Each structure stands twice: as structure tokens, then as C-alpha cells.
A protein has these predicted regions:
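Active-site-adjacent loops and short helices of periplasmic peptidoglycan-processing enzymes
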Residues: 1-71, 75-84, 88, 148
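Non-catalytic terminal segments and appended small domains
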Residues: 333-335
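Domain-terminus/edge residues, biased toward the C-terminal soluble/receptor-binding domains
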Residues: 50-51, 65-67, 71-304, 312, ...
Length: 342
């Protein structure tokens, strides 16, 4: 208690040595308590598609309400592979923590995953990372990544005895590499599109520019060997336009790849950022709006003046015509003779 470590050092301790106290420390650092962190983890697992996972602690020690499945764990592992910093950590077999405020000596951490250790009889040359786990109740569990010929596989085994977690994982990898291949479905350019970006200001849509949406890389799908790419159906979900600020790397659409009843989703991300309206731009819009309003008022007043002038002229004209008509009628009437008495 009271020792200061970097988050990077703590994560290495968790990955290489399953350090329970380090896991609890991270939980409290991120969410304030182990309970809140466990709830956070469960929510994140659901976002990744996990349907049978519930966490109640940060270290994985046995609890009836703390559980997962091999499939759910593979989904979590797949997400980790998307982040290069974690891929790097998971592939390490040794790490040194230098002296700290409470420890005067360097601590040497050695990984427990024997499939990553070239000196172990269980070494698997295509394995690139993973994590071990053990409790009396759960037995040996193992999550491992392996890569060969562009194909990355994730193997998860649970409740194993002795060294079964290594031998079973190796058997799964051998089967996967022998029977499956990573097939290119589309290039980035095949699903690159540009859409307008707008922002609502003063109840009007203001054009902010355009954003290019595309996959982050060429799209691949793992298929049984010999299966053509045309066997995969692709459904796109691309917006016609985007409202509001866009950050580079933001997910704005998806590709849904389907084969044999299974679906894989590929994110379409923003290739460029689009900024919101600046205060200067808003001021210009306000000025333009005010100028337009003044013009409309001026035009309205001008039209009203013209209408009034027309009404005045028409009224005078009608009055003049009436006067002329009365005058003409008086001229046309016969004059009466008057008799005068003498």
C-alpha cells in the first residue's frame, strides 16, 4: 500500500504474473471501486457481443456470480487484438519493474504462458500472445492468439487438468490452420464514400464540409479453404449525411459480412475530421442573417409604399373619372326656360 507504479507497469504485472493486488488497484484507479469496475467490465462485455458473462471482481478469483464462456472470452480477446499496445504486452515473456518509492530493488517478471516460451516443450512457434488463468474451482484456463499466412486465430480452453490447456490449444490451432484461410472480400477503395456534414445553427442546416468514410484496411473473412470470396454477402450501412462535428477515426457506418448464417461487422470510419462552426463563423452567419432580415424589411416597406401609392393613384383616378362623368352629364341636361313677370 502506498507504492507508486505506472499504469504500464501494473498492466505488465497483471498479464505476466496475474497480480491480484494490481488488478484491484487498476479497478479503483479507473472506476473508484472494485464493484464499480466489475459493473463497467460487464457492460463493456455486452457491447462486444458477450451474452453469458458477468463480472463481480477485477482479479478473476472464484465467485458463483463471476462467470463467462469460451465464446465470450474469444470476443473479448478479439477486441484486445485491435489495440497494438495490448498486442505487444500480451506477446512479452519478461519485464522489469525498476525501483519505486517503496521498493529499492528491480523486480523481474517472467511470463507463465509456456506456448510463448521458446525453451518450453509446449512452445508453439505461431503463437503471438495470450493469458493464463487458474483457480481450484475453474482449473487451468488459457486464451491464446496465433498467426500464420495472414490468418489470425484465437483459441480459448477452460477447466483443463495438468497441461491439457497447452495441448488442447495446440490441437485447435493445428485444425484451424489446416482447414481455414483468410480470404480478401474487398479493398478499402471498394467501400469508400464521401458524404456531407452539416450543423444546425439558428434552426438552419449549415454546411461544414465533407467526410470520407471507408474501412480502416482491406476487408478479409475467415472461410473454409477453397471457398470463394463470392460466397460472402456484403450489406452496407452508410449514412447519406452526418450531423455535427466529426472526429478522424470515428465510426460512421458498417459493413455486414454474412456467410453460412454467421455475420461479421466491419466498421466504416471517418478518414478526416470536420470541425464545428467557430465563433467567427457563427458571427458571420448572424451578420448575414441580420442583413438578410433588413433587406427583407426594406423590400417589404418598399412594396407597401408602392401598394399605397397605387391605391392613392387609383383612388384619385376613380375620383377624377367620377367628376368628369358628373360634369359631362350636367352639360347634356336641357336647360329650363324661366318666365319673368313684368
Amino acid at each position: 500500500e502506498g507504492e507508486t507504479l505506472t499504469l504500464e507497469q501494473v498492466l505488465r504485472a497483471i498479464i505476466l504474473r496475474s497480480a491480484n493486488e494490481a488488478s484491484n488497484g487498476v479497478a479503483e484507479y479507473v472506476d473508484g471501486s472494485v464493484e464499480a469496475f466489475a459493473k463497467h467490465m460487464t457492460e463493456r462485455a455486452k457491447e462486444l457481443g458477450c451474452t453469458n458473462t458477468n463480472f463481480v471482481n477485477a482479479n478473476g478469483l472464484f465467485d458463483e456470480n463471476h462467470y463467462t464462456t469460451a465464446h465470450d472470452m474469444a470476443l473479448i480477446a478479439r477486441e484486445l487484438l485491435k489495440h497494438e499496445e495490448y498486442r505487444s504486452m500480451m506477446s512479452e515473456t519478461d519485464y522489469e519493474i525498476p525501483p519505486t518509492n517503496l521498493q529499492t530493488e528491480t523486480r523481474y517478471l517472467h511470463g507463465q504462458h509456456q506456448m510463448l516460451n521458446p525453451n518450453s516443450i509446449y512452445y508453439y512457434k505461431d503463437a503471438i500472445g495470450g493469458k493464463t488463468g487458474y483457480t481450484v474451482e475453474a482449473g487451468n484456463t488459457l486464451v491464446t492468439y496465433a498467426e500464420r499466412d495472414g490468418l489470425t486465430l484465437i483459441a480459448v480452453v477452460m477447466k483443463c487438468n495438468g497441461a491439457e490447456h497447452y495441448t488442447d490449444t495446440a490441437a485447435l490451432f493445428d485444425y484451424g490452420f489446416a482447414n481455414y484461410a483468410s480470404v480478401k472480400i474487398a479493398a478499402v477503395s471498394d467501400y469508400t464514400s464521401t458524404v456531407p456534414v452539416t450543423e444546425t445553427y439558428n434552426k438552419k442546416a449549415v454546411d461544414l464540409g465533407k467526410v470520407t468514410i471507408a474501412p480502416s484496411e482491406d476487408v478479409y473473412y475467415t472461410l473454409p479453404k477453397g471457398t470463394d470470396a463470392s460466397a460472402v454477402t456484403v450489406k452496407t450501412d452508410i449514412p447519406e449525411g452526418v450531423e455535427g462535428t466529426v472526429k478522424k477515426g470515428q465510426t460512421l457506418g458498417t459493413l455486414q459480412l454474412s456467410y453460412n448464417g454467421k455475420t461479421q461487422t466491419v466498421d466504416l470510419i471517418a478518414q478526416n475530421a470536420v470541425d464545428a462552426l467557430t465563433d467567427t463563423q457563427k458571427a458571420e452567419l448572424d451578420k448575414s442573417s441580420l442583413s438578410g432580415m433588413v433587406k427583407r424589411v426594406a423590400i417589404g416597406v418598399g412594396i407597401a409604399a408602392i401598394v399605397l401609392l397605387l391605391i392613392f393613384c387609383i383612388t384619385r383616378f376613380i375620383g377624377y373619372r367620377s367628376y368628369q362623368r358628373r360634369k359631362q352629364l350636367r352639360r347634356q341636361r336641357p336647360r329650363r326656360r324661366r318666365n319673368y313677370r313684368r
